[in-house]
């Protein structure tokens, strides 16, 4: 029934050694937007266990969504050295590594200190879950965010990641 599970697969230029993957999820193991040794150890343990692809948790990349210091931030060059080290450590076990870019838009509850954040979305309609009223994004900001996606993807490539995933579901910015 699972005859392809341990077979390699190609995703664009990346060759994934098997069909077992670790999806992106918030670990809160980052600090001040950068990769920590704890985050590297967390992913290396999964790579040692035989995971074929790790998609590193959602990374912020634009100032309109930077509200939690435990989030990784691909909007700054400081992300590159830690991601390189993470990717190198996982590759030692044959695991490919992608990074996920993430902008919540209006789908935000509160900041780490419990205050309501200043958030932006295409309109001032609040999110159904969190009910925080966003500010409508000015047209210039829309173009800045688009440009920031591209710049962040370049940083992930400079960090030797094998691919980039853009989170476009769950009511986050692109889905708004």
Report each predicted region and the residues it spans.
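Flavin-dependent oxidoreductase catalytic cores
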Residues: 1-176
């Amino acid at each position: 029934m699972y005859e392809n599970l341990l077979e390699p697969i190609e995703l664009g230029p990346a060759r994934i050694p098997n069909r077992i993957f670790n999806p992106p999820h918030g670990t809160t193991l980052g600090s001040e937007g950068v990769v920590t040794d704890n985050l590297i150890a967390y992913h290396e343990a999964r790579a040692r266990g035989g995971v074929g692809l790790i998609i590193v948790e959602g990374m912020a990349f634009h100032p309109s969504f930077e509200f939690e210091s435990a989030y990784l931030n691909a909007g700054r060059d400081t992300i590159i050295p830690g991601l390189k080290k993470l990717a190198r450590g996982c590759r030692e076990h044959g695991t490919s590594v992608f990074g996920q870019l993430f902008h919540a838009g209006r789908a935000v509850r509160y900041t780490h200190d419990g205050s309501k954040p200043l958030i932006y979305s295409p309109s001032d309609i609040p999110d159904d879950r969190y009910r925080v009223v966003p500010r409508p994004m000015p047209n210039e900001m829309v173009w800045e965010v688009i440009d920031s996606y591209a710049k962040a993807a370049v940083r992930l490539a400079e960090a030797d990641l094998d691919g980039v995933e853009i989170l476009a579901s769950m009511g986050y910015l692109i889905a708004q």
